[in-house]
Regions:
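Short, small-residue alpha-helix embedded
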Residues: 64, 125-149
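Short pre-catalytic strand/loop immediately N-terminal to key active-site residues, enriched for Gly-Thr
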Residues: 115-129
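Short, charged, surface-exposed loops that flank catalytic or proteolytic processing sites
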Residues: 70-77, 144-154
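Conserved phosphate/ATP/ADP-binding segment of small-molecule kinases
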Residues: 38-115
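Glycine/small-residue-rich loop that forms an oxyanion/phosphate-binding "nest" at active or ligand-binding sites
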Residues: 1-47, 57
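Structural signal for hydrophobic packing residues in well-ordered secondary-structure cores
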Residues: 13, 17, 52, 88, ...
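Glycine-rich beta-alpha junction loops
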Residues: 1, 27-29, 61, 97-100, ...
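Charged C-terminal helix
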Residues: 150-195
Length: 195
């Protein structure tokens, strides 16, 4: 079953001896608000969160992992981040995206000591397929290149903001983010504030 695969992923990480483990807890299809497989949530909590260096849920996923349900504010995000941190992940970044504000993109990072709000301008949203996966991959890459978890998360936010801003239309239904935009077109500034 899928829970067995989740458990095996956690085991493989430990067996690998890798320094960092970034978990992107994909639970829903884009545009949906129902968990694909509810048993997977508990498996992620049990087998992945205690082993992860960084976990990168969106608002819906953070609500599921924390058990708090729908998150609608920075305060809700802080509560969820604390609960997820308490489950064993030392670095929690909750991606708020456009859900809290139509003009700004707010994410919340928690390292067990301080909450940080990461803010960028909101860019076009029509062509943003792959943004969440790209964020987790960019965080992983920045960690592998020697950045601290906080530095990696901030750099990944900038990378993805540029990728979203420069996303492109693939067809009438979807368009991906532009993974090369940060290096080729522009680097987006991320405002970091303690909250």
């Amino acid at each position: 079953g899928t829970q067995d695969i989740i458990k095996r992923a956690g085991d493989v990480f430990v067996e690998s001896g890798a320094d960092y483990f970034v978990v992107d807890p994909v639970m829903v299809c884009k545009g949906e608000d129902e968990v694909l497989n509810p048993g997977n949530t508990e498996a992620m909590i049990q087998y992945l969160l205690p082993k992860a260096t960084v976990v990168t849920p969106n608002l819906f996923e953070a609500g599921q992992l924390s058990g708090l349900g729908k998150l609608t504010s920075i305060e809700d995000m802080k509560k969820a981040a604390q609960v997820i941190y308490d489950k064993g992940t030392p670095h929690v970044i909750i991606k708020g995206g456009k859900a809290l504000d139509q003009d700004k993109s707010y994410d919340l990072y928690y390292d067990g000591q301080q909450f940080y709000q990461l803010t960028t301008d909101m860019f076009q949203q029509s062509y943003n397929h792959g943004a969440g996966c790209t964020f987790a991959a960019a965080t992983t890459a920045y960690l592998a290149n020697g950045k601290s978890p906080k530095e990696a998360i901030i750099a990944a936010k900038a990378f993805v903001a540029s990728a979203i801003k420069n996303g492109w239309k693939m067809n009438d239904f979807v368009g991906p983010v532009d993974h090369g935009a940060y290096n080729r077109i522009e680097q987006i500034n991320v405002e970091v504030t303690e909250v």
